[in-house]
């Protein structure tokens, strides 16, 4: 006899017919991405910020944050409404933790055949992307003086040397299972959660506040009753179904 479905997943299973109808009948939602660009200076000059983050949703700037002094420098209009939420606070807390971790690693980094033009500065792009088919992709890119040195694929935990000067850096970080796990979890768990929150917020802003009123006794139009908006479809595909 087949095992009964867990009560925890029944609400998710209940939406599958609607999801499949939307997939076949109304087209697929676009992919979406969330990027965090860190700039970490090992020995900053007087007045320089040692840690700054520039963030983008779908390649549009939404946050500039000094993670050294815990100060929001600027944010987009839509994000102002998220500022006082728990999710926003958790995001800033994690960005500070990432900045501190990167600073510690930078202090102990040995680069070969590379002379920085100024104070040793690490530029890091951490990103998570939800593709149109619901696949979540996480990655890290590490650069010095604007030149790519090292890549990390969070999905398969693979390190790739782009610049020969990063060979020792790659060997050291690859052996550090704690660091590898940290990078994977931030980009695949935390970043994914933040992207979900931003998409949900944007979805609420774009959807009408109330459905069209209808005369009593009239059947609800099929397009309303059985389809999902692209935003709803993407959120379900990327953030709900993977947990089934």
UniProtKB/Swiss-Prot annotation:
Residues annotated as signal peptide: 1-29
Region described as MHC class I alpha-1 like: 30-118
Main location: membrane
Topology term for the membrane: Lipid-anchor; GPI-anchor
Record's keyword terms, sorted: Cell membrane, Disulfide bond, Glycoprotein, GPI-anchor, Host-virus interaction, Immunity, Lipoprotein, Membrane, Signal
Region (MHC class I alpha-2 like): 119-209
Gene Ontology, cellular component aspect: external side of plasma membrane; extracellular space; plasma membrane
One Gene Ontology biological process: antigen processing and presentation of endogenous peptide antigen via MHC class Ib
Cited InterPro entries: MHC_class-I_related, MHC_I-like_Ag-recog, MHC_I-like_Ag-recog_sf, MHC_I/II-like_Ag-recog
Residue ranges annotated as propeptide in the record: 218-244
Top-level division of the source organism's lineage: Eukaryota
Residues carrying a glycan: 37
The keyword Transmembrane helix belongs to this UniProt entry's keyword annotation: no
Positions where lipid (GPI-anchor amidated glycine) attaches: 217
Sample GO molecular function, one term: natural killer cell lectin-like receptor binding
Coiled coil: none
Location(s), subcellular: Cell membrane
Keyword Cytoplasm among record annotations: no
Disulfide-linked positions: 51-67, 128-191
Quaternary data: Interacts with KLRK1/NKG2D. Does not bind to beta2-microglobulin. (Microbial infection) In CMV-infected cells, interacts with the viral glycoprotein UL16 and UL142; this interaction causes ULBP3 retention in the endoplasmic reticulum and cis-Golgi and prevents binding to and activation of KLRK1/NKG2D, providing CMV with an immune evasion mechanism.
Protein role: Binds and activates the KLRK1/NKG2D receptor, mediating natural killer cell cytotoxicity.
Anything else known: UL16-binding proteins (ULBPs) are unusual members of the extended MHC class I superfamily. They do not contain the alpha 3 domain and lack a transmembrane domain.
Recorded family membership: Belongs to the MHC class I family.
Protein name (Swiss-Prot/TrEMBL): UL16-binding protein 3
Organism classification: Eukaryota, Metazoa, Chordata, Craniata, Vertebrata
Gene that encodes the chain: ULBP3
